[in-house]
Every structure is written in structure tokens, then in C-alpha cells.
Amino acid sequence: MKHLLTLMEFKPHEVEDLLRISRDFKARYMAGEVYTPLFPGRIVMLYFEKPSTRTRLSLTAAAAQLGMQAVYTAPGELQIGRGETIADTMRVVSRYAAAVAARVYKHETLEEMARYSSIPVINALSDRHHPLQALADALTLWERSGRLHGLKVAFVGDVSNNVATSLAVVGAKLGWEVRLVGPKPLWNQKLVEELAEDLAKTGGQIYFTDSMNEVAGVDGVYTDVWVSMGFEKEAEERRRLLKPYQVNQRVMDIAGKRAVFLHCLPAHRGEEVTDEVIDGPQSAVWDQAENRMHTAKAVFAYLLNKRA
């Protein structure tokens, strides 16, 4: 049974396959073929412990466009909120649904869900990884640059978070140079070690730096909120630590005119990014958000073993 818990478990050619399927789905969509009913009448369970806009809606839209129905659930709506085990829950859900997409606080929850599931489990965000976002990021950069391999991308700010981690993973699979630009207390050198085998195969490079000048010459400048869900108690300390890493027009000028601006959203305007940048001519965030839907379709099709 193939799951999508992280992209680390996927080989480089499998990541490329997902992105090519995504591009094909988007081309069909843009040509007016919105409805591609590959899985008519099937059910996708969305299990969300955290609130969501893009992830929930993109998965719901993707399921509908493939002929499926998405059923949204939260812990308080299921017996799991009253003590039923994850194991028992997944054994039951596997009899009803074709796949489960789960947005959870702890990555270990996803691992346990997958352990007892006989249907694909998809990571819709955990504290450690956000693979659906990384696929949309890669598709967006491919569209904007015209290249899938050999890109240079700088992630600026909280380089320890799930979005930065998944960006590094997809970059390692595609032979990118990923520059993780942020304060030293947030560096995770273990990540580079974990991706060493893929980097050796693809010729990619990942490194940490605290210099904002390292955004020079990149294809994309990426940032995310300074205070992620679950870190509210550390809000003031994180804002103090990350204040020097705001993406403003000066940063984009250093990056150069070729660079596009990326943000997974929601954005805290005036903190990690200025209005001038996110609403500016180099911003690709709205294409990036749309691409969440097309890459979600690709993930469903890939894991359920059927392509358009």
C-alpha cells in the first residue's frame, strides 16, 4: 500500500511522475475539461485536527473533479475524540473510503494511521512535513522558470518548519540548490544528512545560512509565517528572532528580476512579507495556491493507480 506521509519515501522519478501528472491535469483544466471522473462514486475522508483553507478546499475540489465525494471530519465529530483507537478507526474507515487525507498535530499520528490502514493515507500537514504544499511549490516554479531540474530556491525565515523541510526534500529529489536562510538556532543540519543519498544521485545541494545576501540569483524566494500553528506560546520570541528575515522589496532586489516570490499562505502581511512583495509583479502566490488543487488530483490518481 502506497501512502504519502513525506516525499522522502518517494524516488526522484516518482516525484517527477507526480509533477507531470499534475501538469497534465492543469492543462486539461485550463482547456475547459474541469471534470475528469476517474473514480466516480468513491469517498475520500478528510480528517483535520487543525483548521485549513487551501488544503481542505483544494482536496475537496480535487476529489470532486475526479468524481469522488470528500467527507470532512474532525476529532470531535468521531468516536476517536472519545477514546476509540486510531487502529480501530482506520480499520473501519478503510471499509468505506478510497483514501484518507489527514491534517494532524503530530506526525506520529499519520504513521499510526498508515500502519492500520488498507487504503492510502495522505499527509495534509503535520508538524514535520507538508508534502502536498511542496508539490504545488515545485509545479509553480516549473511553470514560471520553464525548468523542473537545477533550480535555485531560497527559503527565508523559519527554516525549521514543515514547509521549509518539505521544500528541501522536493529540491533534493529534483536536483535543486535549496538555500535555507534563517537564524542559526533554527538550523536542522540533520535534514541535510537525511537527504544526502538523494542529493548525491541528483546533484542537488542544500545548505543553511544566516545571510540574506544568499538570496542573490535564485529562481524563487519563499517564506512562511513566523509563528506556525502550535507555536503560539513562543510568538514574541519567534518574532524577535525572525524580524531580520522579512521578505521586502530590498530582498527581492537582491534576488533579481528573475526570482518569483512564493508563500504557502496564510500570510501575516507586514511580518514575514510586505504588501509590496506579495502583491507585486514577482509574486506567484495565487498560481501556487491554485496548483494545490492540481497536484492534489495527481496524488489521488497516483495513489489510487489510475491516470487520466
Curated annotation (Swiss-Prot):
Annotated catalysed reactions: carbamoyl phosphate + L-ornithine = L-citrulline + phosphate + H(+)
Residues bound to carbamoyl phosphate: S52, T53, R54, T55, Q79, R103, H130, P131, L132, Q133, C264, L265, R292
SUPFAM superfamilies for the chain: Aspartate/ornithine carbamoyltransferase
MF terms (GO), sorted A to Z: amino acid binding; ornithine carbamoyltransferase activity
Pfam families: OTCace, OTCace_N
Domain of life: Archaea
Signal peptide: none
GO cellular component terms, semicolon-separated: cytoplasm
EC number: 2.1.3.3
Binding annotation for L-ornithine: N162, D224, S228, M229
Predominant localisation class: cytoplasm
InterPro entries for this protein: Asp/Orn_carbamoyltranf_P-bd, Asp/Orn_carbamoylTrfase, Asp/Orn_carbamoylTrfase_sf, Asp_carbamoyltransf_Asp/Orn-bd, Orn/put_carbamltrans, OTCase_ArgI
Zinc as UniProt keyword: no
Pathway(s) per entry: Amino-acid biosynthesis; L-arginine biosynthesis; L-arginine from L-ornithine and carbamoyl phosphate: step 1/3
An individual GO BP term: citrulline biosynthetic process
Sorted UniProt keywords: Amino-acid biosynthesis, Arginine biosynthesis, Cytoplasm, Transferase
Keyword Transferase: yes
Subcellular location: Cytoplasm
Transmembrane domains' residue ranges: none
Family listed: Belongs to the aspartate/ornithine carbamoyltransferase superfamily. OTCase family.
Protein's job: Reversibly catalyzes the transfer of the carbamoyl group from carbamoyl phosphate (CP) to the N(epsilon) atom of ornithine (ORN) to produce L-citrulline.
NCBIfam families according to UniProt: orni_carb_tr, PRK00779.1
Matching HAMAP family: OTCase
UniProt name for this protein: Ornithine carbamoyltransferase
Species in which this protein is naturally found: Pyrobaculum calidifontis (strain DSM 21063 / JCM 11548 / VA1)
Top-level taxonomy: Archaea, Thermoproteota, Thermoprotei, Thermoproteales, Thermoproteaceae
